[in-house]
Every structure is written in C-alpha cells, then in structure tokens.
A protein has these predicted regions:
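Conserved HGGG/HGGXW glycine-rich cap/lid loop of the alpha/beta-hydrolase fold
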Residues: 9-56
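Conserved loop-alpha-helix segment in the C-terminal half of the alpha/beta-hydrolase fold
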Residues: 35, 203-245
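Residue in the alpha/beta-hydrolase core beta-strand immediately N-terminal to the catalytic nucleophile
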Residues: 47, 83, 105-107
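Conserved acidic catalytic loop of the alpha/beta-hydrolase fold
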Residues: 64-82
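Gly/Ala-rich beta-loop-alpha elbow adjacent to hydrolase catalytic centers
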Residues: 86, 90, 94
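Flexible "cap/lid" loop of the alpha/beta hydrolase fold
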Residues: 103-141
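Conserved alpha/beta-hydrolase catalytic His-Asp/Glu region
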Residues: 142-204
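Catalytic histidine-centered segment of alpha/beta-hydrolase-like enzymes
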Residues: 239-258
Length: 262
C-alpha cells in the first residue's frame, strides 16, 4: 500500500511543543512518543521543506532557509515560542530556533553539525551515507510492504537508526522507507550543507538545553559527532547518553525519550 504523507501533525493539550524530524525523515518519526507527549503538551510536528509531505522547494535549502521556513510554520500555527525537540538535523534546527528566541527549552537528540570543522572526512561520510541510503530506499520502496512483513526485513530496514526494532510497527517502518525515497533534492541540499558549513550562535541561546545521544549511533557516532557541542557551543547543557541506543532514540526507546522531553 502506498503511504500517505502529510505536512504536519497537531494534537494534545498543554504547553506548546514543536517536534522536528531529521534529514530525509517525516514528522511520523515521532509516532511512538506522541501519545505520552500529547498528555502534557499541545504538540506541533511539521514536515520540513523538501521532505515527503512537506512544502516544495524552489531551490535547495541551507540551515538559514530551513529555520526561516520553520519560523513561518510556527507563526501560522500560532506559536510565538515553544518547547522544541528535534532529532539529527531537526535537533540542530531546534538549537537554531533557540538562538532566534523561539524556544522556551530544547531537547536535541543526536543533533547534526557538531563534528569538528577540521574533520572534512566526517562531512564526506555524511554525504555518502545519505546518498547511499536514498538510493537503497528508492530501490526498496516498491517492495516496502513485503520487506517489513518479516522480522529480518524490519531489522535490516532499521539497523542504521535503531538498535531495537521489534516494537516498531511494520507500517511505520514501511512509511520510513518510502519517506526517504520521496525526499526531494537530497544531493543538492547536502551540497549546500557542505558548502555553507555548520555554525551555531550558541551565545544567543538562553533557554534550558538538554542534549541526548545514543552510545550506538551509527549515523552520528558518539562522541566524535558531538565534539563542537561539548567543547565549544554547549558544554554546560544537560548531557544524557543512552546506552546501546541508536541514532533515532525516539524510535529506539520512545518511553525514555518522552520522559526526557518532559
């Protein structure tokens, strides 16, 4: 069955919370934590521009353009500020929004951009990973339902982003495969990221920040991918390392992540 992609999710009641997904993902990466979060929060989870279900792109976006787009989305949603949680690229964008004064707190799960500037091989590895991942996803997407019908298929489909997969619904894994395949402009967006680099005006962040990292992250390995956050940008943040957890902690250990978001 071909999945349906939507531009955002809104649900729950309480203090406002914005949840931001990672590169090539969609808002549904938060599916497993939403029930717990929506008991305490008015949750707004948008899909980023250029991603499956999200706004189309006139040109490949960089970080500033992505943050501009998220500010517009928050404005339309009636959110002047909010608690913000983000994974990977979404974690980095959450911190950028905090630097613009739009966050009352941030929980960043394995945020992107924290590797050392003098490590070009890291950037090259990220580009190669996402390029290869999308090629695989596009080849697999027509067969996604068949792939996730077996435990081995579900394990292989999630092995780079989680260490545990048994609790993740097959339908959600199939949606993830097809979402990666449908993400537009992966190559050009990565080129912009490499060209522009990753910078954070951390001195402008005045809200509480918690950074969460899985010790078994295969996409942004701990601790090398966190170097600039730990040494330069946010050494005094509340740091949490989750043992034997992968890159997408919200999928790997959803109950623990819901508690960490608060």
């Amino acid at each position: 069955m071909r999945p349906t992609f939507t531009s955002s999710h809104r649900g729950g009641s309480g203090s406002p919370l914005v949840c931001l997904h990672g590169f090539t993902d969609t808002w549904r990466t938060w599916d497993l934590v939403l029930p717990a979060l929506e008991r305490r929060h008015d949750v707004f989870a948008p899909t980023l521009p250029g991603h499956a279900g999200g706004p189309s792109l006139d040109r490949p976006f960089g970080v500033n353009e992505a943050v501009d787009a998220l500010e517009r989305m928050m404005d339309v949603a009636g959110l002047t500020s909010a608690h913000i949680a983000g994974n990977s690229l979404g974690g980095f964008l959450a911190l950028q929004l905090a630097a613009r004064g739009r966050a009352t707190s941030v929980v960043a799960l394995a945020p992107a951009g924290g590797w050392r500037r003098d490590d070009p091989l890291f950037s090259d590895a990220i580009v190669e990973h996402f390029t290869a991942m999308q090629e695989l996803a596009r080849a697999a997407a027509p067969y996604a339902d068949s792939i996730v019908a077996s435990a081995e298929g579900r394990r292989r489909a999630t092995e780079f982003i989680t260490t545990e997969f048994e609790h993740i619904p097959a339908e959600l894994i199939a949606h993830q495969i097809c979402g990666v395949a449908a993400c537009t402009d992966v190559g050009p967006v990565l080129e912009v990221a490499v060209r522009d680099g990753w910078e954070l005006a951390a001195e402008r962040i005045t809200c509480p920040v918690r950074i969460v990292w899985g010790s078994n992250d295969k996409v942004l390995p701990w601790p090398s991918a966190a170097a600039r956050f730990r040494e330069e940008w946010l050494p005094h943040a509340d740091w949490v390392v989750l043992d034997d957890v992968g890159h997408c902690a919200q999928l790997d250990t959803p109950l623990e992540v819901a508690e960490l978001i608060g």
